[in-house]
A protein has these predicted regions:
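Single conserved hydrophobic/aromatic residue that forms the stacking wall/gate
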Residues: 1-6, 11
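Short coil-to-beta strand junction motifs in C2/discoidin
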Residues: 32, 361-369
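Long, ordered, helix-rich scaffold segments
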Residues: 235-237, 243, 348-350, 359-361, ...
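Hydrophobic alpha-helical and helix-loop surface patches within well-folded domains
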Residues: 68, 94-360, 480, 487, ...
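Beta-strand elements of well-folded, non-transmembrane domains
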Residues: 42-44, 353-355, 373-377
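Short polybasic amphipathic segments
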Residues: 38, 369-374
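Hydrophobic helix-coil surface modules that form long, contiguous segments used
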Residues: 12-20, 25-183, 211-215, 248, ...
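Solvent-exposed beta-strand/loop surfaces of large extracellular or lumenal domains
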Residues: 7-8, 50-61, 377-391
Length: 634
């Protein structure tokens, strides 16, 4: 992938999986890890960067030639080259030299990245029990960069929109994304770089682990961002993708670059992450970490396959990971665990492959499901762990008495759907807020939707349950319910039903707007600022609420006059709502502001709003602009 800004800057990276051979001769496969030495000649005044620090620089004929230090053993796809008039922001308190690298005159937007990198790096070094393995760590913001980021050894590339934030207007959502992506990419320096998968069928050894570790470290270092809630939402998204008839397994044969490019990221990243979290929770954090450390230490600077990791985890935990985790790695699909109380403390657990109505998906083999039941015996809430290895098993809960209730997936750390029957499910929804954790309630939103799509509850039951969950006290439960309703709206709400749907939105979402307010309040919880944009969008767009639309117009005028006068979290939804009833004057203003904006988030806001004008001639103009070649990728 190349990135060009005028004639000033060039980035050549993202060689994964087979593009390095187009840049230089090499054995372009991940198993070939060698030491590389890069030499670059660039015009005087430009700066050359690669994976290692410079070793020697000479000047001749208007060019500077820099020979860089030899790398540690690494595969070809992790090489990166950058040339340009960069600005540098030093990052303090790190174990290795570290900088944020920006395009010229954009260093002022690197403050958040420079501040959150040291604690992330320190937490990762602590987890692995060993220091960062390379000579330097440069984090570079790349304009016109298609991937979110790329974990090149010592020179990690990021989209500008992720790495560069306006310190005065950056939102909680932006800061959370920066932290999570940063933790993911730095985690790759161990997972994927220090130890590399031998072939692309084990890409999960890179991406599943970096996703799991990135979210884990973000939650540890920045608990205010509620990354554990974001994680469970990602897990639920993976379950939805994993219910497709055409889905592949986490480990799948990769015979060509076309197959590699077509792999479903929600499986390789999110499902793999969820499976790792499930097994870590089942065997315990310390035993799991011991296995991970042994895997890294035994395979450092080399390549590995899944069996290497599974053997280390088996040895540290005493659990047969080859068999148990193998049932999740090597077949597609989501286990569906049904829980049926039999009396006298006995419970029947049964497993099958979860599927939606009218699907006929086959299960290749029984899963070995690490089930963690959560139940109340009347005096206290208990957990009971069981490895479900058969199609059905009868277990006995400690104590021998029938529980008041059973949650089949304690804290939703397991990668499986569950079924307690429609009546019990609706009873659980009714008492969810006072009984279950925020993670469990967020997942319950998705559980209710999945049960409807499987034909186990009616559409009326779904709306009744969703209305209850919409009134949850935790903003992230509300946000999840709104997102889920968006999918239902697209599937079921026709033009004829739209007036009734708008009335339902105003009735159901309106009280939430009153609860949280349209404008941010000083000292409010971060989760409130995450849900407010969704509430504004729903009321202004699908609710067509006149008060919210008037508010959005006022905010838009204020934002156009002074960016600092409007909280960044509400600017985007207000611009989009204002566009719904906007005229050509507003359309041209948004287009002009988009073209002039230097802050990545501002460009995104105006560009998104350009697509929301309802007049057909404006929609046609927006489409023409998109296809004209004038539109930058970011």
């Amino acid at each position: 992938a190349s990135s060009l800004v005028g004639s000033e800057m060039c980035i050549r990276d993202r060689f994964e999986a087979t593009d390095a051979r187009g840049a230089f001769p090499c054995f372009d496969e991940p198993q070939f890890k060698i030491e590389w030495q890069v030499t670059m000649s660039v015009p005087v005044g430009d700066v050359a960067l690669t994976n290692t620090p410079p070793e020697e620089t000479t000047a001749k004929g208007g060019f500077e030639t820099t020979r860089f230090m030899r790398t540690k053993p690494m595969p070809s796809y992790l090489i990166a080259l950058a040339v340009g008039p960069f600005d540098f922001v030093p990052v303090e308190d790190t174990s290795t030299p570290c900088r944020i690298v920006t395009p010229k005159d954009k260093a002022w937007m690197a403050k958040d990245a420079a501040e959150n990198t040291p604690p992330i790096l320190a937490a990762l070094e602590d987890y692995f029990g060993r220091p960062y393995p390379y000579r330097k760590l440069d984090l570079i913001a790349v304009p016109e960069f298609n991937p979110g980021a790329m974990e090149n050894v010592g020179l990690i590339t990021y989209r500008e929109t992720i790495l560069l934030l306006d310190p005065e207007t950056a939102t909680v959502a932006q800061k959370r994304t920066l932290s999570a992506v940063n933790a993911h990419e730095i985690a790759h320096q161990w997972y994927g770089n220090l130890v590399t998968m031998e072939w692309w069928d084990d890409l999960w050894l890179n991406e599943s682990f970096a996703s799991w570790m990135g979210d884990k470290i973000t939650q540890q270092v920045f608990p205010e961002f509620g990354m554990d809630i974001t994680t469970v939402r990602g897990n639920e998204g993976a379950k939805n993708s994993d219910t497709s008839a055409a889905v592949h397994a986490i480990r799948a044969p990769v015979m060509s670059n076309a197959v590699f490019e077509s792999m479903d990221a929600t499986i390789t990243y999110s499902k793999g992450q969820a499976v790792l979290e499930m097994f870590e929770n089942f065997v315990g954090e310390e035993l799991f970490r011991e296995g991970v450390r042994n895997y890294i230490n035994q395979n450092e600077w080399g390549s590995a396959v899944a069996a290497d990791l599974l053997e280390n985890l088996s040895e540290s935990s005493g659990v047969d990971f080859h068999t148990a985790m193998g049932t999740f790695l090597d077949q597609p699909g989501v286990p569906d665990v049904s829980v049926t109380p039999l009396g006298d403390g006995k419970v029947e657990l049964a497993q099958s492959r979860f599927q939606f109505l009218d699907q006929d998906l086959q299960q290749e083999m029984p899963w070995q499901v690490p089930v963690v039941l959560k139940y109340s015996d009347g005096s206290q809430v208990r957990e009971h762990r069981v490895m479900l290895t058969e199609p059905s098993e009868v277990i006995e809960l400690p104590g021998g008495a029938d529980p008041e209730w059973i949650h089949p997936n304690s804290n939703e750390t397991g990668y499986y759907r569950w079924d307690v029957g429609p009546e019990k499910l609706l009873e659980m929804v009714a008492v969810a807020q006072e009984t279950f954790t925020p993670r469990e309630r967020v997942a319950m939103v998705e559980q209710v939707s999945a049960q409807m799509r499987a034909g186990r509850i009616t559409g009326g039951d779904y709306l009744e349950a969703t209305t209850v969950l919409l009134n949850d006290e935790h903003p992230e439960v509300v946000n999840t319910a709104l997102g889920n309703l968006g999918e239902v709206r697209m599937a079921f709400v026709t033009a004829e039903l739209m007036p009734a749907f708008r009335a339902w939105v105003r009735q159901s979402v309106g009280p939430l707007v009153e609860r949280y307010g349209l404008t941010p309040q000083e000292g409010e919880d971060e989760s409130v600022s995450l849900v407010r944009p969704s509430l504004i969008a729903w009321m202004g767009n699908w609710g067509a609420d006149p008060e919210v639309r008037a508010f959005a117009s006022e905010v838009t005028e204020a934002y156009l006059a002074d960016r600092q006068s409007v909280d960044g979290s509400i600017a985007g939804p207000c611009l989009r709502i204002a566009a719904i009833e906007g005229d050509w004057r507003l359309y041209n203003t948004f287009k002009k502001e988009y073209e002039a904006a230097s802050v990545p988030a501002e460009r995104q806001r105006f560009l998104s709003a350009l697509g929301r004008f309802q007049d057909w001639s404006m929609q046609e103009a927006a489409l023409d602009f998109t296809l004209s070649g004038e539109l930058r990728p970011q």
